[in-house]
């Protein structure tokens, strides 16, 4: 989605920006699946994987319309898995925590995001791209043959936390 559609209040999202976000983040995966499914059927099955983000379930500052688009993507994963399962085609998503990359360095306040994740994740650390790749290998390989319609969180447990640790600062 255009940068202003992410940073402006959600209520100010235009129809065009909404459509762009859904087209790029959701429909593109459906279109890719439509193209790949016949090839996978001929091979006796396969596995499709997409990336999503916790902003699909929770409100994150400066994510706005992308959160709605990712929620639609996750629903699409479930519907596609139901439709394609009988042909032995698995459809899943990975919801990764923030990863320190060159692209991420351009995100305002990204070091603060990393700090919050590290402080509140049960594993008390951030993740790296290799850990996301390992999860993808599992889901795409025969090791994940019984997994479909799922969103696998690779975020050091951050998604599982409610308020996080409550500290008594009065003492």
For each feature predicted by the language model, list its residue ranges.
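A short, exposed helix-loop element centered on a Lys and neighboring polar residues
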Residues: 33-34, 78
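Short, small/polar-rich loop/turn modules that mediate ligand/substrate recognition or access, typified
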Residues: 85, 90, 147-149
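A conserved structural motif in NAD(P)-dependent oxidoreductases
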Residues: 121-132
């Amino acid at each position: 989605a255009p940068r202003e559609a992410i940073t402006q209040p959600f209520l100010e999202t235009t129809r065009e920006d909404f459509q762009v976000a859904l087209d790029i983040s959701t429909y593109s995966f459906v279109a890719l699946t439509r193209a790949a499914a016949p090839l996978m059927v001929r091979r006796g099955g396969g596995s499709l994987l997409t990336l999503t983000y916790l902003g699909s379930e929770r409100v994150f500052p400066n994510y706005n319309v992308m959160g709605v688009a990712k929620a639609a993507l996750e629903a699409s994963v479930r519907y596609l898995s139901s439709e394609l399962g009988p042909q032995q085609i698995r459809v899943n998503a990975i919801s990764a925590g923030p990863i320190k990359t060159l692209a991420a360095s351009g995100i305002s306040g990204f070091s603060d995001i990393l700090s919050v994740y590290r402080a509140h994740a049960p594993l008390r650390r951030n993740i790296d791209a290799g850990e996301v790749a390992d999860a993808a290998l599992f889901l795409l390989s025969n090791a994940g043959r019984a997994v479909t319609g799922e969103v696998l969180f690779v975020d050091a447990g951050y998604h599982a936390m409610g308020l996080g640790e409550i500290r008594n600062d009065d003492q």
